[in-house]
Amino acid sequence: MLKAVKIALGLLSLGAVVVLGVFWYMETRHEREPSRVTFLDHCASCHTASGGGSDLLTQYHTNDSADELTKRILVQHSDLIKSAQFPEPMVKALALYVIEQRQELPSITNSHAHTIPGHVVESLHHDFKVELITKVGKGPYSIEPLPDGRILLVEKVRGLSVIDTSGKQGALVDGTPQVWPEILQVGGSFAVLGSMLDVELHPDYATNGWIYLSHSDRCQLDCGSPWPISMVRVIRGRLAGNRWIDSEVIWSVDKNKYTLVPDAVASGRLAFDHQGFGYVTVGGKSTYDNLHVMDTPYGKIHRFKNNGSVPEDNPFWLGKQLSDPTSSRKTVWTYGHRTAQGLSTDPRTGKIWATEMGPRGGDEINLIQRGGNYGWPLYTEGLDYNAEYISIGKELGLDFEFSETIPPVVDFTPAPSLSNFTFHNGDQFPNWQNDLLVGSLRAQVLFRIRIEEGKLIEKERLLTKLGRIRDVEMGYDGFVYLLIEHNQT
């Protein structure tokens, strides 16, 4: 008995040390970031407001892209690069750091402040105001406006609730899947296994009342693992008052695909095309060696019929007779994704688009095409967080040409941490019609993106320093609704 107590205490102590170590790492990683340290050691004495040279951080060549500034540094500071023995990717990392400062990108830890402008905001095509509807708890993830003016709200560690037309948030809806408290919270980022994610209405919601939820289904003790594990799952049900009824599982994977990787990279975004097929994003909830294995769900976008059956024209399905029941290949639509945090349908064409977070740089807006390989982790415009090239793809033996991948329609480098988005489709702001309204987390910016014939035409910052914009949706009244994430209770 005494030995068992000692072992238990030892495990608790080890767990406490691990938690404290993770907390310290997350809270201090900005100060330890290699390109920041290198800039302060080698560049700041000249290229800041207090230095003797041009202020790279604010005043000089402010429209440089990362590639352009990298070339400029290589040409103008070749002697320093040689004498300091900068590794090749460090020059690009320095360029990213400089542009991040110009764009006033906060560190992730410091990105949770939020300010609602009290004045009319001027923009290229429309002036507008931002109005507060309601304040919600910590960890909001998604919203879905209803035809009657109410709004469905999902909070990761609380669940589903309804905001009425007066802005009052109701009690949690009874009968939805269980969610679990966070294991760890650092600066507003949650480490959790078993959270609620996205909410989406059936295309014919007005007649059938179906509501789709994605969540991270948690399994413990009876899954062959001594630890809790989780995986993205899609269900649908209806609301009867404040109760969730008629619930049924629409998309899920075998329990042997559940993992210990926290839900922060689960993704779980939902969308429907004009034919009524549903799509769900699954992030890298596994080691990277699984992202290009078709029998696994990770790093992919999956397609299903709205009743949960499998479309027979899915590109990697082998048919009922040949399919392994534990495989998820039957619903794979695209692969090679990192963390697709946004999913939306073009109202003109019914085509599916996605936003994807890169590492340090390489955030993307992608047109989702049947069977497409989106390249991660072999190809990306981003760097690793240690200021090195992303090498994991080569280390895993991935071998395909860039020409075999589908490149992003829009690349964001540096990375603003793109989140969810919508296509503008309403009467209140007609000059934005069909433009993408894209949220971002770290940058705290609402972007307006105009794409024509697959090309970027306009990119505008409609709102800055608003807060971490987790979701963007169109209301039935033609107004744009934003969900701001924060770290307050």
List the predicted regions and their residue ranges.
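Beta-propeller domain segments
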Residues: 110-123, 181-190, 194-196, 204, ...
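Axial heme c-ligation environment in periplasmic c-type cytochrome domains
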Residues: 52-61, 70-107
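Asp-box/WD-like beta-propeller blade repeats and closely related beta-sheet repeat scaffolds
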Residues: 225-271
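Periplasmic/extracellular electron-transfer cofactor-ligation site
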Residues: 30-32, 36-62, 100-107, 309-327, ...
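Electrostatic cytochrome c docking/interface patches
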Residues: 19-38, 266, 329
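Gly/Gly-Pro-rich "capping" loops immediately C-terminal to redox-active cysteine motifs
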Residues: 33-36, 44-78, 170-178, 291, ...
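Surface loop/turn motifs at the tips and blade-to-blade linkers of beta-strand repeat domains
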Residues: 132-137, 174-175, 190-191, 251-254, ...
